[in-house]
Amino acid sequence: MKWSDIMWEDHPFSSAECARVKCDPYTVSIVTEINEPGLFEVAILNEHHTFVNLPGIHPVDTDPFDDVLRYQTQEEVVGIIRKIESITGNEPLNVYS
């Protein structure tokens, strides 16, 4: 998946934009950082819609309850999606509200 493939929507609770990309069994939630143009926060959810930390994506020393990756660049977001695609073997698809 390329950056240009990600489909954006208005965030329902803020002035941010958001996108969700499904790569079974995971969903990647991407939200623009409102006060940091060009940066994004990323969360990964499992099939039960629970936040998860994945090895190779989240830093090893991450607090297990700190599951949102803040201040990610476009390249880092695409890298996260590609890593999940590699882990799962499934093609990433946009999810619409």
Model-derived features with residue positions:
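Mixed-charge, Lys/Arg-enriched low-complexity segments
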Residues: 3, 45-97
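Membrane-helix boundary/juxtamembrane interface motif
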Residues: 17-19, 37-45, 50
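Negatively charged, low-complexity tracts enriched in Asp/Glu with abundant Ser/Thr
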Residues: 1-37, 63-65
